[in-house]
């Protein structure tokens, strides 16, 4: 029984990412993503303000949420693949 418990603990440690890293989409395609570098704790998505369809023009990792501009609206989030 102790062996089974120890095995489960070892498998859990191996399977979990001990140093949490955020994964963000980094292209317009929603199924492609990258692991963010250390210190980049937010995902962002930029869309054109004046365009009727809210198609993302830029996605990626950020340390701070970028500020909206005259053309782009930024939305930020902090969970995996949330952008």
Curated annotation (Swiss-Prot):
SUPFAM superfamilies: Snake toxin-like. Expressed by the venom gland. InterPro entries: Cytotoxin_Cobra, Snake_3FTx, Snake_toxin-like_sf, Snake_toxin_con_site, Toxin_cobra-type. Keywords: Cytolysis, Disulfide bond, Hemolysis, Membrane, Secreted, Signal, Target cell membrane, Target membrane, Toxin. It comes from the Eukaryota. It holds the Pfam family Toxin_cobra-type. GO terms for biological process: killing of cells of another organism. PROSITE patterns: SNAKE_TOXIN (PS00272). It is found in: Secreted; Target cell membrane. GO terms for cellular component: extracellular region; membrane; other organism cell membrane. GO terms for molecular function: toxin activity. Residues 1-21 form the signal peptide. Disulfide bonds join 24-43, 36-61, 65-76, 77-82. Belongs to the three-finger toxin family. Short-chain subfamily. Orphan group XV sub-subfamily. Has low cytotoxic activity. This is Cytotoxin homolog 5. The lineage of its organism: Eukaryota, Metazoa, Chordata, Craniata, Vertebrata.
